[in-house]
Amino acid sequence: MISPAQDPYASRTDRSSAIIARQDPVVYGEGKFADALSADQVQSYERDGFLLLENLFSDEEVAALLAEVERMTRDPAIVRREEAITEPGSNAVRSIFMVHVLSPILGRLVRDPRLANAARQILGAEVYVHQSRANMKPGFKGKEFYWHSDFETWHVEDGMPSMRALSCSVLLTDNNEANGPLMLVPGSHRQFISCVGETPRDHYKQSLKKQEYGVPDPVSLQLLAEQGGISTMTGKAGSVVFFDCNTMHGSNSNISPWPRANVFMVYNSMENTLNPPKYGLNPRPEHIATRQAFKAVRPLDSLKLVER
């Protein structure tokens, strides 16, 4: 087991918080493994730690995806499953995990070349699905999600070795300034924030509702925001946000009348598969972090997502 002293991205140990320079590339293989993105788009992703592509999916595709997500949130058989996470203090569904397995159309979405080939291009390798989920923020009562780096959690709680993973968020509703859109700190992917506090047992049961461990300290957050600012990912339904696993991000609550729904697909390099979790922690369940049943994503041959 690697000790905190040997871990280049040590976090949640008995030491104080720290800002650590990233030791991994952002774009692997010079972005030449696939050709879904232009050179300018790859450069923008490498610089900022994220990339917004507007109107990547058609209205017909978005309607089919949104209808499927809404069906899943109403299906008692799915809502009772451990993959379904409710909002703090209510029975409203906040997230559904492993959606690429639970739903045929979302299983096709994760293989859509517009997503999968972009991930393969940036990560410079074949990829697999580390995690997939649908996130909902109903109007008036959708809760916030505090600032965090996904990699901090995936490294500590899942044993992900390196920063060679990315998320893509497919917007299924219009995301505007009022309904709690994703916020990202440009350039924050270049620095790893080591967090304080020992991870409780089965932390995931609480953190998926409200994360309290593995969150950065206010001083580090302020420094990152002063250096890079904060970008709000607003866009029409059908747009997609790709963002690096270490980009600092969060979202406000939704007290507007307009619901927000997104589907997240997390791609990890086949050369970056999980080790045991850090510091003696137990592995999180398979539906949160794919450890056993993984295989390389084979992109679909066409852009035909919706089957007639």
Curated annotation (Swiss-Prot):
Name of the protein this chain belongs to: Ectoine dioxygenase
Subunit structure: Homodimer.
Residues the UniProt record annotates as site (Important for ectoine stabilization): 154
InterPro entries associated with the record: EctD, Phytyl_CoA_dOase-like
Keywords: Dioxygenase, Iron, Metal-binding, Oxidoreductase
Residue numbers binding L-ectoine: 131
Similarity remark: Belongs to the PhyH family. EctD subfamily.
Enzyme Commission designation: 1.14.11.55
GO biological process: ectoine catabolic process
Signal peptide bounds: none
Top EC category: oxidoreductase
